[in-house]
Amino acid sequence: MTVIAVTSWEGTPEAIENLIKGSKASAPIHEKMGAKNPRLWRAIAGDGMESAFYSIEFESHSAYGAFTDEMLGSDWWKEQIVEAAGAAYPDLKNNGTTVYYYAIEID
């Protein structure tokens, strides 16, 4: 069952540009930890120009759990989320991560 984790970010234009740079640097690290298809989504029209959504995919809930265990124990977590994202607040806000499953996946 495909699982996708989507982290919602909100920030100033400068903070979002820094998030883009950070996401580019983080994507290969996340892939080494087991994530697939890291992407940063931005609005092209309408509301939400101050928002960005970072998504990563997994083959199963257990794969997502293994990724989370590794990520939370990593230096990357401490340096990029706790320290860098913490220092960017309130210009950049992490609004949390929602985990979805692909409900109509066909075997």
Language model regions located:
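An amphipathic, aromatic/His-enriched active-site/gating alpha helix that lines ligand/cofactor pockets
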Residues: K21-R39, G48, E57-T98
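Conserved beta-strand-loop-alpha-helix junction that forms the acyl-donor binding cleft
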Residues: A45
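Specificity-determining recognition surfaces
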Residues: A103-I104
